[in-house]
């Protein structure tokens, strides 16, 4: 009874088709932009997984960001600085866009000093060995001839978006300017779902994720982290234990023939004409097909030499061919063997 219960539980997830292929198509900058394609998925799962992954990618990944800045000679964000074209409000907005990767825990400090005329960029910031600036080309401000500027930044780790007001400590000294912090290393995520085909079945989903990060994490690693977060959050809803003992007691059966013989012919990517001919001849399993001779196949209505060559090529790739003799085919428990072959546990 317990065994039957376990098998009934397992059928809920093991009977669903899982993605067999995950393609990574890098963009112009493969450390920041990529398209990730997962297929095939059961119908409807493309939308389910795509929406969940997108929300987690944008909201839940940890990163690092500037939380406050001190500027020499500046008491508050509504000031202006002699010889600096931007006012402090604009400078703070630019500082918010600095992308950093921090190794270890914060808070950490970064500094920059410059004398005009020049553009002050993020690449001029002096960091320790545990901080990297990911967008050194970012322009923070512009200095006129003879102008000087010194700034000290505080960098911390966190998650999501934190407004400047939350970054102001209660004992903040005069001159400390809090900054809105965008911790998420993921900048943009979009997804779409397209139909894909498995054999003759065309109603499976293909999930296509387009991901752009700030460079602190690659798109491939970002989606892996998002999937792990979802896995961890959903674990609490599982109110039964995995039947590990059952798995040990029921090893994958050893078959007296090539396991591909248990596959159905509609899983083969054959032309519509070839597939219809097999269906009309009541050929269900590859084991049924290989026992047919070439002459028998050519006597099938609408089945020609082109279809014959197509099938021979597909069978050859599996180490099979027409005209084979398979002892005791079909086995009496073929449906059970098919299930165990697809889901060995």
UniProtKB/Swiss-Prot annotation:
Pfam families referenced in this protein's UniProt entry, alphabetically: RNA_pol_A_bac, RNA_pol_A_CTD, RNA_pol_L
Source organism, top-level taxon: Bacteria
Keywords in alphabetical order: DNA-directed RNA polymerase, Nucleotidyltransferase, Transcription, Transferase
Listed GO CC annotations: cytoplasm; DNA-directed RNA polymerase complex
InterPro entries: DNA-dir_RNA_pol_insert (IPR011262), DNA-dir_RNA_pol_RpoA/D/Rpb3 (IPR011263), DNA-dir_RpoA (IPR011773), RBP11-like (IPR036603), RNAP_asu_C (IPR011260), RNApol_insert_sf (IPR036643)
GO molecular function: DNA binding; DNA-directed RNA polymerase activity; protein dimerization activity
EC number: 2.7.7.6
Region (Alpha N-terminal domain (alpha-NTD)): 1-241
Any single biological process term in GO: DNA-templated transcription
Region Alpha C-terminal domain (alpha-CTD): start-end pairs: 257-345
Recorded catalytic activity of this chain's protein: RNA(n) + a ribonucleoside 5'-triphosphate = RNA(n+1) + diphosphate
General function of this protein: DNA-dependent RNA polymerase catalyzes the transcription of DNA into RNA using the four ribonucleoside triphosphates as substrates.
Subunit structure: Homodimer. The RNAP catalytic core consists of 2 alpha, 1 beta, 1 beta' and 1 omega subunit. When a sigma factor is associated with the core the holoenzyme is formed, which can initiate transcription.
Free-text note on domains in this protein's UniProt record: The N-terminal domain is essential for RNAP assembly and basal transcription, whereas the C-terminal domain is involved in interaction with transcriptional regulators and with upstream promoter elements.
Family as reported in the entry's similarity comment: Belongs to the RNA polymerase alpha chain family.
Protein name, entry field: DNA-directed RNA polymerase subunit alpha
Organism: Acidiphilium cryptum (strain JF-5)
Taxonomic lineage of the native organism: Bacteria, Pseudomonadati, Pseudomonadota, Alphaproteobacteria, Acetobacterales
């Amino acid at each position: 009874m317990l065994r039957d219960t376990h098998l009934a539980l397992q059928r809920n997830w093991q009977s669903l088709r899982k993605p067999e292929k995950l393609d990574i198509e890098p963009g112009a900058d493969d450390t920041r932009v990529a398209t990730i394609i997962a297929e095939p998925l059961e119908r409807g799962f493309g939308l389910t997984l795509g929406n969940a992954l997108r929300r987690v990618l944008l909201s839940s990944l940890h990163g690092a960001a500037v939380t406050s800045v001190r500027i020499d000679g500046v008491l508050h964000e509504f000031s202006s600085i002699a010889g600096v074209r931007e006012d402090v409000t604009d400078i703070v907005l630019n500082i918010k866009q600095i992308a950093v990767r921090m190794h270890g825990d914060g808070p950490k400090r970064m500094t920059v000093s410059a004398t005009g005329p020049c553009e002050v960029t993020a690449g001029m910031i002096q960091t320790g060995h545990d901080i990297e600036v990911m967008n050194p080309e970012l322009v923070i401000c512009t200095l006129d001839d003879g102008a000087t500027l010194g700034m000290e930044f505080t960098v911390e780790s966190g998650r999501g978006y934190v407004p400047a007001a939350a970054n102001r400590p209660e004992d903040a000294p005069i001159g400390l300017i809090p900054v809105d912090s965008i911790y998420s290393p993921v900048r943009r995520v979009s997804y779409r779902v397209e139909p894909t085909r498995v054999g003759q079945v065309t109603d499976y989903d293909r999930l296509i994720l387009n991901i752009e990060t700030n460079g602190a994490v690659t798109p491939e690693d970002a989606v892996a982290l998002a999937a792990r977060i979802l896995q961890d959050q959903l674990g609490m809803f599982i109110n039964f234990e995995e039947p590990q003992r059952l798995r040990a007691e029921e090893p994958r059966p050893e078959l007296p023939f090539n396991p591909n013989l248990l596959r159905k012919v509609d899983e083969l990517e054959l032309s519509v004409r070839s597939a219809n001919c097999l269906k009309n001849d009541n050929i269900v399993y590859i084991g049924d097909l290989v026992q047919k001779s070439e002459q028998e196949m050519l006597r099938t209505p609408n089945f020609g030499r082109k279809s014959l060559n197509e099938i021979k090529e597909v069978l050859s790739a599996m180490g099979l061919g027409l005209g084979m003799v398979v002892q005791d085919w079909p086995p009496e428990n073929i449906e059970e063997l098919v299930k165990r072959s697809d889901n060995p546990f």
